[in-house]
Amino acid sequence: MPKAKGKTRRQKFGYNVNRKRLNRNARRKAAPRIECSHIRHAWDQTKSVRQNLAEMGLAMDPNRAVPLLKRKVKAMEVDVEERPKELVRKPYVLNDLEAEASLPEKKGNTLSRDLIDYVRYMVENHGENYKAMARDEKNYYQDTPKQIRNKINVYKRFYPAEWQAFTDSLQKNKMEVE
């Protein structure tokens, strides 16, 4: 099929455009991703940040949410008017956030699988003899007896239930062998 007739010009680079400013403005205008899923799902793009947060029962400015009382004006206390409470249209967001905050935090610190296997191997083969563990061929990092003892203590502290089950199984195996 023949090509359509007409002028085909190559695109020229726009030297007069400030690319740095263009990218900066594009980044500013792009709305950031809201990490909290509860807030993200309740967010209304047509409203401002202050309006969205007020609908959810959240405060934009913590200083305005809980104002400090001035101590000088004690005689005028009778005339003080309280600000009307803002209407919370989306209370489920606040309830979800409170429920999530009340959950216990998960422990993020764990030991590597290699270290767990190393400790189990050493205790299985040598029991409490740390000098023999230091001379073992599986002691790749040439740990001293004290370093090995510390690694075993760390394992005991991180996984007390697993350690108890492991030592019980070792005792049971020892009884069966004898």
Swiss-Prot record:
- Carrying Phosphothreonine, the residues are T8, T144
From the Swiss-Prot or TrEMBL record, give the protein name. Nucleolar protein 16
The covalently linked position for Glycyl lysine isopeptide (Lys-Gly) (interchain with G-Cter in SUMO2), per the record, is K74
Q: Which residues carry this modification: N6-acetyllysine?
A: K90
| UniProt-listed InterPro entries | Ribosome_biogenesis_Nop16
| Biological processes, Gene Ontology terms | ribosomal large subunit biogenesis
Extract the Pfam families matched here: Nop16 (PF09420)
Protein's cellular compartments: Nucleus, Nucleolus
Coiled-coil ranges (or none): none
The text of the family note is: Belongs to the NOP16 family.
Q: Which GO terms describe its cellular component?
A: nucleolus
Mostly located where? nucleus
- Give the record's keywords alphabetically: Acetylation, Isopeptide bond, Nucleus, Phosphoprotein, Ubl conjugation
